[in-house]
């Protein structure tokens, strides 16, 4: 799965592959692809990943599609591996047979403790990246973001020696705030809306609370409503923003890719939020399970712009305040979250159904302390 199109023709994004694998059941259910063809794609992809260079089961962020080797400068990434496994497990449960066997094999070989750091106070967190050349780790998942699926996969590891301490899910900062008169929610560092979506594409957090009583699904509902209101309140500053054009998220922008776009509240200084008028349709569309009415209204609005359409649906982003700028590319992870959330909304939670039926995932939810409400 390419990272983007038409740009970077040789670069594959591991997270995008995960989204693509989980999209195959959606494609089959909607008769977009024959089941045998989809199964063959899934099996071929997993066979390729079985032989890709990895460390303790963790994959690099990017690989060359022509050589199947890590892209230059790419780090080994825990979150991208987790999103890939989310798709692999979903496809495995849907297709069964060799696809399921391969998915289980790839999941089984991941040593989640390899990426774990223990702090002086005894708390544990995942590192963000690993540089195999220097044998050093970088960053830490010490703040709420898109990483919840990592704890689910780590707690459900098929091999007990590779399994994380479930308390890790409670060892990152859970700061709560509000935007305007909205409901409070645990917010992410940059306030980017994708951080409230990615794990939710796979893990069904509906009607569940963790040991601290947090309903993560409702948390994303409140975050999505806040993201929309933020754009409504700033529509006088940025022509792209409005009640049907919202959801600041990492995306292409007139100045290049920007991973820091987001709304309030956020862990970073709110007065320094990067809000430069660019909107990615994936922001609002990725929240369709949280705010269906608002997200569908946004989709209808976006399709009014002829220049925003492309071979693969809506382009990655646009900015009406900057010479009516439209992105040239579509990006794999942005298309991925759009398709998976649409599938969950339209096809009765199809990705949730197959990911959550995996026996290791069910055990993980119990180990992490989730209960039904």
PLM feature segments, named:
Residues 1-373:
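Ser/Thr/Asn(+Pro)-rich, low-complexity disordered segments
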């Amino acid at each position: 799965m390419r990272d983007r199109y038409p740009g970077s023709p040789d670069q594959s994004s591991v997270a995008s592959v995960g989204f693509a694998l989980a999209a195959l059941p959606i494609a089959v259910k909607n008769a977009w692809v024959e089941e045998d063809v989809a199964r063959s794609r899934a099996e071929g992809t997993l066979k390729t990943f079985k032989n890709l260079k990895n460390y303790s089961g963790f994959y690099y962020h990017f690989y060359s599609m022509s050589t199947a080797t890590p892209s230059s400068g790419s780090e080994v990434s825990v979150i991208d591996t987790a999103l890939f496994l989310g798709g692999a497990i979903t496809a495995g449960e849907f297709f069964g047979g060799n696809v399921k066997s391969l998915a289980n094999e790839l999941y089984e070989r991941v040593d989640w403790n390899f990426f774990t750091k223990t702090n002086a106070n005894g708390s544990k967190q995942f590192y963000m990246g690993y540089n195999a050349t220097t044998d050093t780790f970088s960053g830490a998942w010490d703040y709420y973001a898109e990483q919840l699926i990592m704890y689910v996969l780590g707690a459900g590891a098929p091999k007990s020696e590779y399994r994380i301490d479930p308390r890790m899910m409670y060892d990152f900062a859970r700061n709560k705030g509000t935007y305007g008169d909205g409901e409070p929610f645990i917010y992410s560092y940059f306030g980017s809306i994708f951080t409230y979506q990615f794990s939710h594409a796979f893990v069904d957090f509906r009607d569940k609370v963790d040991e601290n009583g947090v309903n993560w699904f409702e948390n994303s509902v409140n975050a999505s409503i806040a993201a929309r209101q933020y754009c409504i309140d700033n529509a006088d500053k940025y022509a792209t923003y409005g009640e049907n054009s919202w959801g600041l998220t990492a995306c292409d922008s007139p100045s290049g890719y920007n991973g820091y776009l987001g709304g309030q509240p956020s862990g970073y200084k709110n007065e320094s939020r990067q809000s430069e008028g660019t909107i990615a349709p994936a922001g609002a569309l990725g929240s369709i399970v949280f705010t269906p009415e608002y997200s569908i209204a946004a989709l209808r609005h976006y399709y009014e712009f002829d220049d925003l359409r492309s071979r693969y649906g809506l382009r990655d982003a646009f900015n009406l305040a900057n010479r009516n700028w439209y992105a040239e590319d579509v990006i794999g992870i942005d298309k991925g979250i759009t398709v998976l959330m649409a599938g969950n909304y339209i096809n009765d939670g199809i990705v949730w159904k197959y990911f959550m039926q995996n026996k290791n995932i069910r055990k993980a939810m119990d180990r992490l302390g989730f209960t039904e409400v």
